[in-house]
Amino acid sequence: MPEGIAEGIGASVRRKEDKKYTTGKGRYTDDINRAGQLYAFFMRSNVAHATIKKIDVSKALTCDGVAAIYTGDDIAADGVGGPICGWTPTNRDGSAPKEPPHPLLAHSKVRYVGDHIAVVIAESLEQARSAAEKITIDLNVLPPVVDLSTAIGNTQIHDEMDDNVYFDWELGDESATASALESAAKIVELTVTNNRVIPNAMEPRAAVAEYDETNESYTLYTTSQNPHLTRLVMAAFMMQIPESKLHVVAPDVGGGFGSKIYIYPEEAVCTWATKKLRRPIKWTADRSEAFLGDAHGRDHVNKVKIGLDQDNKIVGLRVDTLANLGAYLSAFSMVTPTYLHGTLLSGCYNIPAIYTNVKGVCTTTVNVDAYRGAGRPEATYLLERTMDYAARQVGMDPAEFRRINFIPKDAFPYQTAVALQYDVGDYEAPLDRALEMINYKGFEKRRSEAAQRGKYRGIGLSSYIEACGIAPSAVVGALGGRVGLYESAVVRVDPTGTVSVFTGTHSHGQGHDTTFAQIVAEKLGIPIGNVDIVHGDTDRIPFGMGTYGSRSLAVGGTAISKALDKVIEKGKIIAAHMLEAADADLEFKDGKFTVAGTDKEKSFGEIALSAYVPHNFPHDRLEPGLEETAFYDPLNFTYPSGTHIAEVEIDPATGVVELVDWACCDDFGNLINPMIVEGQVHGGIAQGVGQALLENAHYDENGQLLTASYMDYCMPRADDFPALKVDYTVTACTHNDLGVKGCGEAGAIASPPALINAVVDALSPLGVTDMSMPASPEKVWRAIHDAQTKAAE
């Protein structure tokens, strides 16, 4: 970097975007208003399962301000389709999975509480809401299907599925795994449940749709993590219009966590209706709608069997999973419990034989799809709970049990038994650092001191690995993916040397305006204040796949790096011409093009100006201008890893679990901005702690969501956390230019098993060996009470 500039790779630069957000200058979808806009309100089902006999909207149509009311019949008459699944794994018998249609408005049947029945469009939201109360609907109520354990073969939900099973998938060698388990010296079995949670992004979903009669095109402002995918699917597969006729803008977005990747009925209905009414239409979810309509996460039941040899080395692992996918499929709902879950079952461990069978189950509940981590947290939770449980069964320290089963650092690249090949890793280094940070050796003294105060103290570990930067596209396609998983970037240098980067990723809390600018600063030697990052507008950015799966830096950042390399190479040719030197003699460093071994030089700004004022320019070799495009399709996943350790105290009188200490050491490869990385780790831990201790989406036997507001759905607050100790080790990714791996989901992946393992450890003197999430005060108190009662018998 030039002297005085310290804003490149590795610098903890303050986020450029924060001033806008902290001063109220953010522009979210609900801030957008169009002249003459109407407001949409969706009437939703209040029963979980029923056929629709009749919908009468006649009285509602007479209400003040009502412009139109549409039902599923209107949508069907126009031939508008519903959302589609983006990745379809093959069943173990070779057949295709079941993909029942997802109507935008229920056409003949409702399948969960919150299912869309009709949309009322009026001059104001209050008028639309009031008119909806005048709609009458005649339903034939059917038995709901809520319990995952009894859903298969229960009351039929879709005509296309007589058994309520979307797919029956497998991965691994069943015969080899059976043989390994049969010959094992010890068998450990555990049923592990991953509870259902609700994403709860700070900003609810919203949409503003507008039709332009002049050029017969649509504009949709929406809360999307992936505007190009929204445009592609909505235009080509749902509305059957040319993709170029739909302009999608995702402005500032207040969090996503996966739930804003997908296309929901509301955005599509508003877009369809705006042409019919020739007026803009606005819809913003309230928080109750978010609970009832946004895709939920997790909800797996796993039966785990692990085999050990005489030295307590793992010889085989079998996992049978039931995955609740809810009433309809969405973008990643089928891949989350299959390829994003089953392929991670080796974890950090050398496991010669692995087999998993996953059944995706339909229930009369809200759709379940990818939520921060997307399959990786589910795999890590079942594996790390089982590792802790097995260590206790064989009488080993949990840390040492993990250590003896780690893949050695000299074994890379390492081919797992479940398809993935890890390029690089060192799992002992973060384990050792985390143990040091938490003072693991001094824990028993702290446990004894807590006991003197009448508290139970426990410590729990989680050593995880995740797969990020999903790719390559050819492999994804062969496995049922319906999109490419590359990323794109355009780097445009202005005549004065400032730079605009147009990226196919999307930033909704990750800090791309800063980290991407740091890559530019590092490569070109310019201040980050001279770099503008553009994203979220399909008319401005190149086609890209958005942000999810910790892919933005590993894939999108590498695309930017490659485009910058092209800019530099063109700049060298221009500089060589101006300096009358050979191309091979040109060097570029710290924002200057120099001729090797001489004092001849041109600044980056001078070369930029020459590209646009090409008086002294190599016209025979180059076109004027300085703008380059790159698409990057990775050769492999990236594999972040690490160890998180939680320490808790439990009050036996109340069952309250207090998180008293946390230490983690992660390997994310090279860090672009350590401060932003730490913030991402903190956020992930908070969400994982929420799931482990507090959060749970609970349905009653009638399919009513009992936790449909913050009165009943508990989330963590700042005072629930100690000061989090965060550190890193580095093994750089071997196959991208930046050596980065991704960091956004690690905390949410590692934290739930660490915390539950700590709770179980705290209660282990009572004989407690397992605890399901969330470890609520009531559940913990009952475990203590039951153990004490049993001991007294």
Residue ranges and their predicted role:
Residues 19-20, 133-144, 225-227, 232, ...:
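Extended active-site and interfacial segments that coordinate phosphate-rich ligands
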Residues 88, 155-238, 406-498, 706-720, ...:
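Helix-loop-helix junctions that connect adjacent transmembrane helices in secondary transporters/permeases
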Residues 1-164, 187-190, 266, 276, ...:
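Flexible, low-hydrophobicity surface segments
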Residues 11, 17-20, 87, 93-100, ...:
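Glycine-rich loop/linker segments at domain edges
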Residues 108-110, 242-250, 275-286, 290:
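Conserved catalytic cysteine-centered active-site region
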Residues 72-73, 240-245, 275-281, 310, ...:
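C-terminal catalytic domains of large/alpha subunits in multi-subunit enzymes
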Residues 252, 256-278, 282-284, 512-520:
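Thiamine diphosphate
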Residues 79-85, 131-134, 200, 222, ...:
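Short acidic, glycine/serine/threonine-rich loops at helix termini
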